[in-house]
Swiss-Prot record:
Pathway: Glycan biosynthesis; glycogen metabolism. Residues 666-688 are annotated as: Disordered. The keyword Chloroplast does not apply. Phosphorylase b kinase catalyzes the phosphorylation of serine in certain substrates, including troponin I. The alpha chain may bind calmodulin. GO terms for biological process: glycogen metabolic process. GO terms for molecular function: calmodulin binding. Keywords: Calmodulin-binding, Carbohydrate metabolism, Glycogen metabolism. Belongs to the phosphorylase b kinase regulatory chain family. This is Probable phosphorylase b kinase regulatory subunit alpha. Residues 679-688 have a biased composition (Basic and acidic residues). It comes from the Eukaryota. Gene3D superfamilies: 1.50.10.10. PANTHER family: PHOSPHORYLASE B KINASE REGULATORY SUBUNIT, PHOSPHORYLASE B KINASE REGULATORY SUBUNIT ALPHA-RELATED.
Amino acid sequence: MRSRSGSGVRLDRILFMVEQTICSHQNPITALFANQKDFPGHAWVRDNVYIAQALWALYRAYMKCADFDEDLTKAKELGFTCVKMMQSILECLMRQAEKVELFKKYQRPLDALHSKFAVGTKGTVCGDADWGHLQMDAISLYLLTLAQITASGLQVVRNFDEVAFIQNLVYYIETGYRTPDYGVWERGDKTNQGIRELNASSIGMVKAALQALNDVGDLFVDGSRGSVVHVLPDEIEQCSAVLSSMLPRESFSKETDAALLGIISYPAFCVEDPELVSQTRETITQRLLGKYGCRRFMRDGYKTVLEDASRLYYNKSELQQFEDIECEWPIFLCYLILDAMYSKDDDAVEAYWRQLESVLVLSDKGFRLVPELYVVLKEHVSAEKAHPGTQDRVPGGATPFLWAQSLYVIICLLYEGFLLPAELDPLSRRLSVYEKRPPCEVQVTVLAESLDVQRELRAHDIHVQCVDEIDPVFTILPASALGQLLAKIGESKKLNLSGRPLDRPIGLLSTSRLYQIGNKFVIFTPQFMDSRRSHLMYDIRILTDEWSSELQYIYASWNSVSISGRPLVVLVITQGMLSTEGLSHFSNIHLNRHMKSTVIGAIKKINTGYLSGARVVMKDLSDFFRTTAVSKMEFRDKSAEDTLRSVAAEKVQFTLLTEDATEAKNEKITTPRGPRTLRRGESVKDRSAYTAVHKASMRHRSIALDSNDADLMKLRLAYKSRPRDLQDMDSTYQSPPPTQTPLGLVKEHSSGELRQQLLKTTRRGAENETTHRDLTAEQMNEMKADDLLDLVNETTVLEEQISIVHCLWMKFGPDYDTELGCQHITVRMLMEEVHTKACEAREWALVRLTAGLLKKQLEELSKAVTHLLVRQKQITVGIASKKEEVITCPKTNEELEKIMNRAYGDDANSFTLAQEIIVYLGSLVRTEPKLFLEMFRLRIGLIIQVLASELSRLRNISGAEAAETLLTVSPFELKSMIFSLLSGRLLEEYAEDGIHYSDTIRETRTGIGSFRRQIEERKSLRKSTRSVGGLEIPKEEDEDEEADEDDFQFGIWLRHRRIDGALNRVPNGFYAILWDTVHKMPHGVKINDTVLHWGLTQEMTRKEIKFALESEEALNRIAEPEYRELVVETLWLLGRLEKLVLLEQPNIPRDRPLDVDHILHVANQIFVDHNKHLETIVMECCASSNPNNTRCDGARNICKHFYDSAPAGEYGTSHYIIRALMQLYS
């Protein structure tokens, strides 16, 4: 008889260890495992999947190293056991199919699949609300393992019902990048309060599962197309973007977490950036690694001797007591060994192996067991806290801990050479971090909607095919049609499962490939090309800007989602994009010509081969057939051709309807908005009646920024320029027409001039209002519905029509039946019609008013909110510091509608304007994330105020006029202004021709951010501009100072501070430094009557996002953004002056909080006294000894010239703040 080889004996020894330490816990009927003494009979999905991985690894080792037939028998037995386990877990999940259907639609925690089941029955073991079941990582880990096992040749999925369920699990997890869950540790945030969070470890596992299922092909392992699972690449890319913004942080409450080891290495391998992988690994080893393993996260009280086991929740103040005595988990040494093996770091493998060997526990039979954790004994707590890492610990929890024991089996197989790391990764996921493919060129096909469009493009030397001219094998449909097709994939009548929810957006990457459906190849146009999605698409410049940014996005993202073939984007040019006449009787012909040139210019740029840094190729559709990515769609129980025909019959129209087309359509009636009922005539003849109607309408049109708004007064940007005669200015100035760009006229004015002009406008408005109020109110009360309807039938002027319909809306309500033309025509139908007219005419003020009254929600809003939130940018809507609604987690369209109604219920214009701004911010945070690096909360109300304030400064107009002008700005110009503010550029420097994004954003941060740049010190220029009795007092200056004076612009730093304050921008690392400051102050820090207590540092760690949000909450109570920014500068300097704080006896207040406002006022007084000594321009306001001179109008009694000082330099604000701090500490 042939003896066994040495390797065979060692492999048998590992198998025997598995049988004795792992398989002894297995239920013989269900093949599931239970391992928790506190929960007997409970089988956790996560634990069982890792056990399946260990059995699968042992199966592969025996298949590879078999000496005899009996070894193959052992291999088959291990393979069958592994498959049975995976099938049992699948059966447990399929018994809750109704939960999958509900969760797809609503993402409610109580609809989540359970995370543990009964070992013996595969049923549930607790109620929906009795456990933190929503664990995206557990379901994703199962799908990832299923894909890897299937790729190795073992078949787990047995029938098409199971395939449909797996497809629905994909729909279940694909929103994981925006779904807060309870995380790997099942208890939510670290206070154990049951608060769900976005967890990086969950998002990483979701991404890995989606990629693996996308790569595995068919689930039957036989090449059958019907068992293919479809994954949308956009969801993978969303996960990548969120991970990049979160790592090495785990969540809001956890700076980092050892669970991240599972996503940067085995088993997920979901992070492609090697620098980010290295940074995450180093963060974990530096902060969490100890002698016995890693702590799960900082201040983790689980199973420590100080934890009160009778309470599930912790008190916030007790978290600090767990610091330095957190339990250490040996399982993470296994993860570190696996990571070192896959990264081929032999030294690290040996070091971690020796460390792991030292913490293993020997069983009675001599087997090495991995305990769950190591605990500090109660008598050693004080010593451990005094000298972390010096005290011995004892094993705690389950021994062996099956999750850890399974990983130990895997590393034993790898360490002893039975398997290579690649053999546990048949999908080659590990290579993504090492193999970098260059960006893939984007293929673009431009098609003309009609022959007329084709001829017009040809006249500009652009040769494209018409839609009707493409090869019959191709079919072109809008993105919404793809959504309908996906809704049919995954359907199962037996399981009562539908396909993908129709309300989920279709991403750009998904529409950038060909789909083979039967004998047809279908191309879907991008979703932003679907017409009539919102009024934004009527601004063609927004559409062409979308072309640029989205093509750049495809160029940068395509290779990261592992799709074979190149992307293809089809753009359909419609008549509405080029026509200079006929869109509407109200159209702005000049604007239409500009639109036409914009579209043609964009196409010519695409044809050059480069667009915004992206490599693009423009050809006919048939030329790209062989190189384009193709995905095949098949439908169970249905003909592919029949399915395609049913969807194509419902397809959305591409074109923006012309007036004639709209008229023809309405003759046939009935559109959702009703028939066109406003007859053609002339202007209203009864001007007196119309005046009353118009004034009533105008009183309800203003946004929250009118001339009496205190916040706008505070936001007024004061500039000092050449003296001007106020009367002349008032008599000669004329407000520019609303259609002119807000960036056109640049004028400068002083604070006093602006305030006097603002007050004059207010007085004139008040006088006019008083004169006409009684008459207008009386006329309106006497008017009946028939009177207003007679007026609306007389006019063809859009402004007049909207004013009259607006009054009908306010007086009789939207559902009032006007009975126009003896038909059922409600006021809402009339409003829908004038809204469409306003869109066609590109009258943006009227568009926003009518859209707000109709409560129209932009389709892009929900997606934009999600883009911001998953990148940790919270949003507030409403009037700043008065009535703000905070959005902290992704919302459904219905929830967003309620929030917007609460915030802007009576303000139709702001209702629309705020949505537009959120959409633009959501677009920019995706394409230009560096613009948002220093922000945690975006306050839409303050952004609106700053935009209006900038327009007031640029055009030298009043607050009311600035608010009106802001409403007339086109969507593209509004996006340009927001981009300009975010990038720190001056609006007057900004060209209106386009948004020119750069591949890398220069660091042009303003305000306190300038401390990161070298700022040249220079003497105060205020000396040379001080006047006495109207005469300039010359000062002796050298030539360099005179040159500086020419360049100096008064008001520039005041403006920067207001913009930074409005955007909530802070320096990098600001909140960590603030944490240090609060931690050193016994009674905390007082900001604007709000105290950041010392106890916050006991509850939250230094770099915890929750602390940043608490601090942000205090700062946001400051109404004046420029004062907020000075407070930020003071706190920043206070935290940086470590030598002062570390004095032996610093004069820190021991009986009260440190008052930041007091420090600022002391610094201001030092500034005033210093400038009084220097006899600068401050002598004319705050430093004046003349009782007739009043103090300046700076916020919070701080001199406006102090606000207008640079942060650094001999005469900068930091100089005076430091002197004030010296007085405090000395």
